[in-house]
Amino acid sequence: MIKILQFGEGNFLRAFAEHYIQTSNENGIYDGKVAICQPRKNTKVINALKEQDCKYNILLKGRLNGEIINEVKSVNCVEECIDTVGEYEELKRIFCLDSLEIVISNTTEAGICFIDTDKMSESPNVSFPAKVTALLYERFKQGKKGLVFLPVELIENNGDELKKCIIKYAKLWNLENKYIDYINNECSFCNTLVDRIVTGKAKYQDDECAVACEPYSSWIIEADERAKNIIP
């Protein structure tokens, strides 16, 4: 069951977020699958993942707590990979699933931005926050529960900044005040800070999507009570 939608198919998130989710599933503290979409037009990684049924491996190499680590984590927590441009209707369907709880993003430091020429009628919109505003509005219209947003973009107060952009778009597009209330009261935008060295694509058997990283990782999340009850 898809509970997490991830904007970002790059090496970092696949070696970082999916490692947490995969481990949480294996340890029985979470039971959820991920759908991954790319925030931009380049579909190279998405297509490669589709060729492998969305499965790949993480190679963990380095020292952790004084021990030398050299192990492989097989990732099977990704259920679907979506082309944001070519499969926008499928992305919209995933965004409106009853089971969806969390949206993770890594759209680079420049990804959380407001572009006042973005229009509601564009599908998909240019900026990442505009895409989210339009998709979240569809979810709101269907009467679905709010979501927890976990942006990992390396900017200060990334959750707050994403929320500000979404509200700006809602006002620019003259969307109803009830939608803004939904954003403010039923969704959680968490500020996060992440730490893991991901060295990039790795060679492992015939896996074209394998990634390598250090074993150490840290994910600091400033969560409200609602988010705490959802984040594993």
Positions of predicted regions on the chain:
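Substrate/ligand-engaging "lid" and interaction regions
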Residues: 1-232
